[in-house]
Each structure stands twice: as structure tokens, then as C-alpha cells.
Amino acid sequence: EKYSDYKAGRKKTPEELSEQFPYVKKLLDCYGIKHYELKNYEADDIIGTMSKEAEKHGYEITIVTGDRDLTQLVTNQTTVALTVKGVTEIEYYTPNHLSEKLGISPSQITDLKGLAGDASDNYPGVSKVGEKTALKLLNQYGTIENLYEHIDEFKKSKMKEHLIEDKEIALTCKNLATIRRDAPLEIGLADIDFAGK
């Protein structure tokens, strides 16, 4: 585990939910909806790897999720449909929408999490740096790495002190937030064809 506190804030999956998984899998099978799991990999990594493979084959992809982390997968071929209020309100993330909403590109989502943190994933980020400040820094420097290359140019301030003190935390959080797109999947695109009616 790269960051010892990672996932510490997450509650363990409730037993009553775990007990339902076999039934959910059977139900998905009945409807011809494919499912897949890979030991030591998160669902995000499987989705990231499979969407990259689908893009190579020219597919248009829509990822439906309630997890904002997946917006880093947005491309001209991949849209992330983020459920905002259950499934009654859905926000469609494209590169343009992300740029209009936050002023950053999909590749900067992990930089944003590295600087501002993310309470839902227990990423602390840099002390006293919120989303607004992080976005301003990313608009100016592009990436966390580039920001730290120019840290000596910052005027003396509390923010500069926090950035220097929390450099390793920022880089670790960025790394943890990065969805792997090279998971060793044992399935291909043909294996996830919808088989239902």
C-alpha cells in the first residue's frame, strides 16, 4: 500500500451488501449483462483498461458512474455519464464540458486530487489548498510536477510553505488517484458483448 491511510476512511463493505453480490451476478447473467473482476485491481482499473482497448478499435464509449474519479478517462471517444441525483440527473463529461466546468483537461484530474485532496478516497492533498486554489495553480503550471519545478519562483507565503511540506503527499495522492489503463485483463472486447434482448 503506497499510502497507509488510503481507504482508511472507507467503511468496510457491509456484510448484508456482500451477501447480495452472488444474486446480483446471477441477475446480470440472466439479462445477458457481462461482469468481470480481477484480483488486486479496482473496478476503475478494469474500466480504464477496457475503455482504452475499445478506443483503439474505434468505439465510442459511455461510462455510467457515480464516481467523479472516472472523469480522468474522458476523451473525444469516451464520455463519462456522471449520476448526480440517483439516475434522475446525469451530467455528461466530455473534454469540452470538463474544460468549461473546471477549466482543466481530463489528464489534470489526478493533479487536482493531488493538490486539493479528496475526502471520499481519503486523499489529504496539500494542507490549506482547496479546489479553487488547486485549479488556479493547475491553470498556471499544468501539472504538479511542473509546479514543483517552479516552486522557488513563488513568493514567500503560507501556501508556499504548505506546498513544500506536503510535496510527497501531493505526488502520492496524484499517483493513487491515477486509474491504471494496463490491467492484465484475461478478457477482450468480444467477451463483453451484450448478450441480452
What positions do the PLM features span?
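Noncatalytic, basic helical substrate-engagement surface that gates or grips nucleic-acid strands
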Residues: E1-V64, L70-T94, I169-G196
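Hydrophobic alpha-helical scaffolding
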Residues: P14-L17, T88, L102, P124-S127, ...
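A conserved hydrophobic position in a structured secondary element of the catalytic/binding core
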Residues: T65-G66, N139
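Alpha-helix/helix-capping structural signal
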Residues: R68-D69, K132
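A short, charged helix-loop
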Residues: V87-S120
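Accessory alpha-helical DNA-binding modules that contact the DNA backbone or grooves
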Residues: S105-Q108, A116-N175, A183-E186
